[in-house]
Amino acid sequence: FLPFLAKILTGVL
């Protein structure tokens, strides 16, 4: 799981 995607998910959540 890429940090970039995690950044997006945390932004959405």
UniProtKB/Swiss-Prot annotation:
It is found in: Secreted. Keywords: Amidation, Amphibian defense peptide, Antibiotic, Antimicrobial, Secreted. The modification Leucine amide is found at L13. Transmembrane segments: none annotated. It comes from the Eukaryota. Expressed by the skin glands. Its main location: secreted. GO terms for cellular component: extracellular region. GO terms for biological process: defense response to bacterium. Antibacterial activity against Gram-positive bacterium S.aureus. Belongs to the frog skin active peptide (FSAP) family. Temporin subfamily. This is Temporin-1Ca. It comes from Lithobates clamitans (Green frog).
